[in-house]
């Protein structure tokens, strides 16, 4: 998938019920050992699946995922982002671009916490359940891209027909970020790529 004339590799996939053996075959030995320490089978799947997906996307340029001090996944010479929901996993890779992705399933519970992340000026663009999930996903994407403090009131999002326009307020300075999105039947996906 191409965004802003830069190669972006993006993949979203529904989680299988059980961990397929071929997911394990692509893991480095250290990754296999790390995964075996995870007692919960669903968490093992969440560990293995994005690594399998990244290996498939990157072929020989795949390298081990390392997490920085903020818990953000990184890979040598490439910007990556990983997102999990209950039933989906999404990964994105960018070369010479910082990337972020978020996948969210439509769920009613978001209505109970909307007051924590919806700004007054966003209420006209984002008022249905699907819109609120899209807004949440956009703010998660901005958070992942900027490594900002997780105060979603510092993120503003406007919706156009084809894109989302995000604004991150940091120490009185606003930075604009263009995001793409896809609305599926059961989930929405938001991603972005910005120059390094």
Q: What are these model-derived regions, one by one?
A:
Residues 1-99, 103-196:
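Core catalytic alpha/beta fold that binds nucleotide/phospho-ligands
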């Amino acid at each position: 998938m191409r965004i802003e004339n830069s190669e972006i590799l993006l993949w979203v996939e529904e989680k299988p019920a059980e961990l397929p053996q071929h997911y394990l075959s692509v893991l480095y030995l250290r990754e296999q050992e790390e995964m075996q320490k995870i007692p919960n089978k669903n968490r093992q799947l969440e560990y293995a699946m994005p690594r399998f997906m990244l290996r498939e996307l990157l072929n020989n340029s795949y390298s081990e995922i390392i997490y920085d001090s903020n818990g953000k996944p990184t890979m040598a010479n490439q910007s990556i982002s990983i997102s999990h929901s209950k039933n989906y996993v999404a990964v994105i890779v960018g070369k010479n671009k910082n990337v972020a992705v978020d996948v969210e399933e439509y769920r009613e519970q978001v209505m109970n916490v909307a007051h924590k992340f919806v700004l007054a000026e966003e209420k006209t663009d984002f008022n249905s359940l699907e819109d609120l999930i899209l807004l949440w996903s956009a703010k998660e994407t901005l958070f992942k891209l900027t490594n900002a403090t997780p105060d979603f009131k510092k993120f503003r999002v406007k919706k156009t027909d084809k894109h989302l326009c995000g604004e991150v307020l940091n120490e009185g300075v606003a930075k604009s970020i263009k995001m793409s999105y896809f609305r599926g039947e059961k989930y929405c996906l938001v991603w972005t790529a910005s120059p390094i």
